[in-house]
Structure formats: structure tokens, C-alpha cells
Amino acid sequence: QRDILALFTPIMRDAAVAEFGPYEALRQHVKRVRQHSLDNLDYYLARFELEATNNGNQVHYADSADEMNSIVLDICQQHGARKVAKGKSMVTEETGLNDYLQRGGLQVMETDLGEYIVQQAGETPSHIAGPALHKTRDQIRELFLDKHDLGERELESISDLVGEARVVLRDHFLQAEVGIIGSNALIAEKGYS
């Protein structure tokens, strides 16, 4: 199934790119903006930290994956958290944050549906934008029947599966004491992500 995904990913990307019009010009512009940001990273990080702090946030820096994971666990423990709701984040995937927090005694639940599915299956994401693209509807159905203690029920349609995930995840959202999200971009001038 992953081989099929590898075949179709470039096709899906090319179809999406076609919708953008002057793709190459946009690509070059983004490349210049990114390089400018990297060339001036110290300034932008300091500015972001100042603005984020002014917004009531606390900014932490880490030199390694272990240090980042330790900082997050410490924050969770300081707040007496037992349950964590975690949004999709490639950084936390790369640092192994979920496993680290679980070893620290926390229950971590992914909030992105695809990430949730692969988490429940004990697998790793197959694709950055579609973590569970390699799973069939029947595989997800069997997984939910096995993992969710919701009694007898019909899980025949995709909407049945999504509805069940919504019920389980909503319960976790309401019980979680800490939420963790990632950010693809930081707005230095505003201190937002």
C-alpha cells in the first residue's frame, strides 16, 4: 500500500500545483522569503519571543530533542496533567514526544484523525499530509472495534467511522489538562504561530 502511495503522491502534488497558476514564480518568492528569514533568524526569534511574551506566553528553547521533550514533560507535570491532547506536529514526531510523555506517565491522544488512527494502530505516519493513507476503511473499522469500548454498533460507512472518532476524541478533549500544537510558521511581529 505504501508503494501505491509513493506512486500517487507526485500525481496528487502536480494536480494541486496546477491550481496555483504561476507556481514557479510563487515558489521562487517563497524561497527568497525563507532565505531572508534564515539569514536574520536571531532577529526574528528575539522579536517573536518579545511579542509572544507580551501576549502572555512563555517561550522555551531547547538544544536537543531530549531537552525539548523534558521541557514539555516538566510543564505538564507542573500543571498536574494526566491527559494531553496533541495536534499534528512533525517536530514532536521527530523528537518522539508521545513516547517520552507516555513514559512520564501521561496519556497522550493525537487530535488529527489520521495521526489518531496510526497512533491507535501503533504505527508511524505514512505521509506528512495523510498519515493514515495506507489504511483501508475495513482496517480502520476493525481497529476502532478493537480499541473503542462502545458496545455493539455499525461502522460500515466512512461517516460512521468519523462519527465514532469524533465521540472518542471529543471526550478526550474535554478531559485533557494540556493541549500541545505545532506551528509551521511564527509571526515575529505579532508573537503568534
Predicted features by range, described:
Residues 1-193:
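The feature marks the mature, well-folded catalytic cores of soluble enzymes
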